[in-house]
Every structure is written in structure tokens, then in C-alpha cells.
């Protein structure tokens, strides 16, 4: 029997076993325990450790997250275990190239547990508390081991905190190659609505690509219009979390619509620029559609005028703002909003919109951030400005998106919250100092009042419109 080091086998002899039962509606989970002896448990964990570390390319983890703040669906995480060092390297489909190595341990806590017990930006992202999510976003980094199958190479896990079931499957390529592929699939999947029929009954739905939620509406007729065509209303709503796969998407639990259960849907990723057909193994077919106001990256380069309000309700217009391609397909450098700095606007390929988000401002024409006294970085801070108060958050997901008016000849955009948070709605921005001193009581230092936007000051309240002039 392979002997694990003391740290990674701590407390095994002291714990009992917990017979964890899998939910029948989920994937099949096989239990392997037939006695509670410390010897058998030690062997069980030793064999699992060898299995994890012995896989040539590593593992794909179906990582599902969510709590009372909302369900955030499934994320593909690529893992490579080094069972000699007790280390794991993790990559997420949400980040193209970042690979992070930390420690893991096989132990017990009311049953056998796989614990990622040192901080890892990928594995702890959704389970770490923040100012916005006080208990994290329902992610786990400790998992009950429900079972594993050496022959079929699958490991079944259940989150200790959120109770979500997760699977580990072996990869057929290095984790960097797999992650790069899933990053592109994740980035290019922006179908927002769908429709179709099941057994002659009409189905429509929405896809929340940010939070990986698939919502189907069972439709019923309630009459006809003047031309005799049926009128429909929603009879029932079904929402299930999903995770993307190399072929399409897979549901956390079967999607049950008009008595038909659908476990997964395949679709062609090459159809990103047009309507997409979803197909299930049982022959169910849905037609997916991209957002009506979706625009390609190339559309946005040009010159603009921006109008924003002030705290007194009047409007200020900044003319001659230029959007210059920075990283193709990803973002634009914004010039003309200030003589003291440049900004970046991100392109969200899922929504076909440009977004202004939290960021460190840049020195004009350079890739260097603006910093005062070698300590205070000037940042553009999302601001939830209201009639009586205003909240500030340092979160790179937060910001505002430019919603197109649908006119290609005279394109104009309305600024709206980008949906980066379920708790916070950005209406404005201001310039602030971020204190890099780790001993400071707070990274929020003070307003950066020595910096200003063209024709105004350090505040950018109530963004209104963004009009393309050429």
C-alpha cells in the first residue's frame, strides 16, 4: 500500500465514515464503503491519491457554485495533481492563461474529504468572502468524496458548504490546451434566447450566460389574434444551472419540459455569428438567438461624444473621445476623456457591447498606471450614486455597458449597469486613490481630486449617452 505523508493523512484513524447518498435526479454516484475500519479508509484514500496523481494530463472538474445570493452555475476547472508534493495546479475557463499551484490534502471530516487547503485564486474565487459577497458566492474548496471508479476514471464529490455535486473526469490533453479551448468556447457563447417545440407544444427561453442559468418557458395558448394566429402566455417556468462542454452544454440536473427530460444540449460553436441550433440526444431541437443589439468588436472603433449628468441634474458633454483598438477583440484605449490619463473600454463578446469598468487609469499613450508618491494608484471607481447616497466598490466586474439604439447609420448608446453584480448597480464613476501600502487600514485612501475629466472634475456622475460621430 502506498504510504501518504503525515500531513496529508492527518486524523484518518480518528474519523468515522459518513454514508452520503446521491440525489437520484443527478448523475450516478457509486458508494464504495462497506465497513468503517481505519485501515480500509487509509487504503481507499491512498488509492485515490495515486489515481489523481497518476493521470497523465490531469482532470476536468465540473465546479458548480451558488448560495442564497444566487446560483452561478458551473465552471470548468482543469486540475493537475502532483501526489508526491501534495500540490495541485488549477486553471479556469474564465481566464485564458493563469495557472496557479497550491496544496491539497486527503483527510476526513465526517467522511473522506478532498480539501484544497491553501489559497488558490481559481479554487477559492467563489468561496472567499468579499465586501460585496460576505459569505462568498457559494463556492467550495472542501469536498466530501462520494466515490471514485478506477475503471471508468471518475471521481464524485460533494461540496461541504453548498452541497453541490461535482465530478472529476480525466483529460486527454494538457491542462493548458484544454483550458485555452474552453476559454474560447466560454467567451464566444453568447446566445441569449431560444425557441422550439416539444411534442407540438411551444417552448421559449432565456440563457443567462454570465451566471450559467438556462430558463425554459412552457407556453400555452389563450386565444388568437385578428389573423387567427394563436396567442401564447407562459404556463410554467423551469430554470436549471448549466456548464459548458466541448460539444455544447450540460445541465446540473435534467431540464424537464412538457414531460421530457433533457440532460444536455449540443450545438455548433462555429455558428457564433448567427442563429444556433441546440440538439439533445433524444432529438429535441431548439433554435438559439444572439441578442438583438449585438455588435461586433470592429464596429466600435471611432470618435464619440459622451454626455453625463452632474449632481445638480445638468448635463456635460465631452466631445472628441477616440476608441482605438488596443488588444484586438478584447478592448479599446480611450483617449480624450482627460488630458491627464487614458482609459480602457472592454468589449463584451457575449453581449456585443462595450463596457467601462473599474480600472487603474493609464498614462497617456503608455501601458503604465498613474501612481502618485510611488504609493497611490489612481483608479476609476464604480459608483452607485443615488438621490441620497452612493456606494463605492473596487471590483473589476463592475461597471456600465453601452446599449445600442439599433441605428447603424447614426449609432447612439445609452449607458446602463453591466450586470456585474446582483447587489450593486453602477450609475456613475469617480477617480480615487488606491493605497498600495499593505499596512493601511483600507485600500480606499481618498478622492483623487487633482485629476479630472475633460470639462469637469474627478467625478463622472450619471452617465447618459455615448454617440458615435465618425
Q: What are these model-predicted stretches?
A:
Residues 7-15:
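Sec-dependent signal peptide recognition
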Residues 60-66, 85-87, 117-123, 307-309, ...:
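Generic short beta-strand segments
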